[in-house]
UniProtKB/Swiss-Prot annotation:
Membrane topology: Lipid-anchor
Any one Gene Ontology cellular component term annotated for this protein: plasma membrane
Main localization category: membrane
Protein name: Uncharacterized lipoprotein MPN_271
Residues with lipidation of kind N-palmitoyl cysteine: C26
Species of provenance: Mycoplasma pneumoniae (strain ATCC 29342 / M129 / Subtype 1)
Pfam families membership: Lipoprotein_3
Covalently attached lipid (S-diacylglycerol cysteine), positions: C26
Sequence similarity: Belongs to the MG439/MG440 family.
Signal sequence interval, chain numbering: 1-25
Cell membrane among keywords: yes
Keyword line: Cell membrane, Lipoprotein, Membrane, Palmitate, Signal
Length: 251
């Protein structure tokens, strides 16, 4: 009984420390952002309130734009620290890696999918030479039997695969103060109608590539069955909204 109590107490303490660490990290980003804006613009913004309104978000982005013009080194570090921290917590900000629209074409296949960030490494001197290397792990949890061709899965089976990711700056679209976007953008919707889309974006144009690998032969078959067209991508350009990571951490 004593041993059981000790383990329960230890688990609770570990959970408390973990929550405290995450809270401290989020608070640290908020404090750094507030101080950076105050130092470079003279504004003292209540971020927790500002982040809840469109005007508040635009004010933060406009202030960060000024900060980047005055102090690009510290502003770059703040934005990339927020990206790294958010990504490690599972906020990827890149829809392609959710795979829901690929793995669930009919939404009736009897499995659920879990994703975890195993490794994330970011190196840079500036946005120009930024390099991100990461490894994500995915698990297919089967809650029913499935059979198609030479592929079968039974209830309770688990299939695992890894995604090895590389992100670099797109050399054709270099980051600059012009990437801090707050104005409306005109575009044509699917019905051909002209409309305006409000923007709260800090746009980083990235070159993204990845490849995937099943943990074992059965998992490799599962990967091929459901994600063959997405198993490897040698590189494409995508715009990543760096502001979404700050928004995630502040909220």
């Amino acid at each position: 009984m004593r041993k059981k109590k000790f383990l329960s107490r230890f688990s609770f303490s570990s959970l408390f420390l973990l929550c405290g660490t995450l809270l401290s990290a989020c608070t640290g980003i908020q404090a750094d952002l507030r101080n950076l804006i105050k130092e470079t613009t003279g504004k003292d913004i209540d971020l927790s309130k500002a982040i809840k309104t469109k005007e508040g978000k635009k004010n933060i982005i406009a202030s960060l734009k000024k900060s980047y013009e005055v102090n690009p080194k510290d502003t770059t570090k703040l934005l990339l620290d927020a990206w790294k921290q958010s990504f490690e917590e599972g906020k990827l900000g890149i829809a392609d890696f959710d795979f829901d629209h690929v793995a669930y074409p009919q939404t009736n296949d009897p499995f659920t999918m879990e994703r975890k960030v195993d490794h994330f490494q970011m190196t840079y001197q500036s946005f120009k030479d930024l390099l991100v290397e990461a490894r994500l792990s995915y698990t297919f949890n089967w809650f029913g039997d499935y059979s198609s061709g030479d592929f079968t899965a039974k209830r309770g089976d688990k299939h695992y695969f890894y995604l090895f990711l590389k992100i670099k700056s797109d050399p054709k679209k270099q980051f600059s103060a012009k990437k801090f976007l707050t104005e409306g953008e005109a575009f044509t919707d699917q019905e051909g109608k002209q409309t305006t889309r409000n923007l709260e974006w800090i746009e980083f144009s990235a070159s993204i590539s990845w490849w995937t690998k099943g943990k074992d032969d059965v998992s490799q078959k599962s990967l091929k069955k459901f994600l063959e067209s997405f198993a490897t991508n040698t590189g494409y350009s995508s715009d990543i909204n760096l502001f979404s990571y700050l928004e995630y951490l502040i909220k």
